[in-house]
Amino acid sequence: RQFRENLYHALDGRTLDYIVVHHMEPDHTAELEDMVLRFPNVQILCTAMAKTMIGQFFGHVYDDRIRVCKEGDTLCTGRHTLQFVAAPMVHWPEVMMTYDRTDKLLLSADAFGCFGALNGHLFADEVDFDRDCLDECRRYYTNIVGKYGPQVKAVLDKAAQLDIAMLLPLHG
């Protein structure tokens, strides 16, 4: 319920045009079916594997609403140009990240995540990162994505080619 309230507040009366599915783990997709029902024209952007998983998770695939994104595909939304970055097996097999070329933001899925929150802050530079976050970032990496070392290295190589002003992980 809180998610929907936050979303409607952010939309400020506008409709939702796109849902970008970075990966299909239930903590990321619990509201997907409800959002598709509430916004009948919304387009779902995801990998081919995520499209298959949507059908497996929800019992049907919204074929008319899904746009499969591959490495390097882009979407111009008007003000923003989004570039999709494949990140398979950085935690789950269907993972992708989104790079906003306009604002230089990398929505990094579970890569670069952290356990915990920033104590009410939105940005890491508003806290003492070394004191308050570093241990939880290490613990997150070790427990969630560390076992996929070669895949994480591949994502780091891709990220190094982007002009990133801010990382926006899905956790932490």
Language-model features: locations:
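Metal-dependent catalytic neighborhoods of phosphoester/phosphodiester hydrolases
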Residues: 30-38
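Short acidic, glycine/serine/threonine-rich loops at helix termini
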Residues: 34, 56-59, 117-121
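Metallo-beta-lactamase
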Residues: 45-170
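Phosphate- and divalent-cation-binding pockets in alpha/beta enzyme and binding domains
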Residues: 2, 30-31, 52-56
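Pre-active-site segment of Zn-dependent metallo-hydrolases
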Residues: 1-19, 26, 38, 42
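Short, glycine/acidic-rich beta->alpha junctions
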Residues: 24-27, 88-90
